[in-house]
C-alpha cells in the first residue's frame, strides 16, 4: 500500500510586498505641482523650499519647477527643494 507519512508544518514561507520606496524624481528634472519626489520611511530626506511632507513622510512638490537636492547644516541633512519654473520668458 502506497502511503505517505504526515509531513511537518513549517512556520516560514511568508514575505511582505515591496513598498516601492525611494526617490521618484531626480535632480534638475522638471515636475508639476503635487508630484511625489521621494517616498520614504522617516525623514531620510527633509522638505526644503516649495516641498511639502505628507503624514507618511512622502515629499511632494508644492509648485511647478525643477528638483534640487542639497546637503545642509552640521548634521549634513539631505534637503529637497523645488526651484519654481517661470516659463520660457523668465529663464
Curated annotation (Swiss-Prot):
Keywords: Ribonucleoprotein, Ribosomal protein. It comes from Chromobacterium violaceum (strain ATCC 12472 / DSM 30191 / JCM 1249 / CCUG 213 / NBRC 12614 / NCIMB 9131 / NCTC 9757 / MK). SUPFAM superfamilies: Ribosomal L27 protein-like. This is Large ribosomal subunit protein bL27. One of its GO terms (cellular component) is cytosolic large ribosomal subunit. GO terms for biological process: translation. InterPro entries: Ribosomal_bL27, Ribosomal_bL27_CS. The keyword Oxidoreductase does not apply. The gene is rpmA. GO terms for molecular function: structural constituent of ribosome. Gene3D superfamilies: 2.40.50.100. PROSITE patterns: RIBOSOMAL_L27. The keyword Transmembrane does not apply. The lineage of its organism: Bacteria, Pseudomonadati, Pseudomonadota, Betaproteobacteria, Neisseriales. It holds the Pfam family Ribosomal_L27.
Amino acid at each position: 500500500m502506497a502511503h505517505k507519512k504526515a509531513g511537518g508544518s513549517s512556520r516560514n514561507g511568508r514575505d511582505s510586498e515591496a513598498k516601492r520606496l525611494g526617490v521618484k524624481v531626480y535632480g534638475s528634472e522638471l515636475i508639476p505641482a503635487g508630484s511625489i519626489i521621494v517616498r520614504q520611511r522617516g525623514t531620510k530626506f527633509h522638505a526644503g523650499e516649495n516641498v511639502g511632507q505628507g503624514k507618511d513622510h512622502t515629499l511632494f512638490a508644492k509648485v511647478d519647477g525643477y528638483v534640487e537636492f542639497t546637503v545642509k547644516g552640521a548634521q549634513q541633512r539631505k534637503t529637497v527643494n523645488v526651484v519654481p519654473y517661470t516659463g520660457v520668458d523668465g529663464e
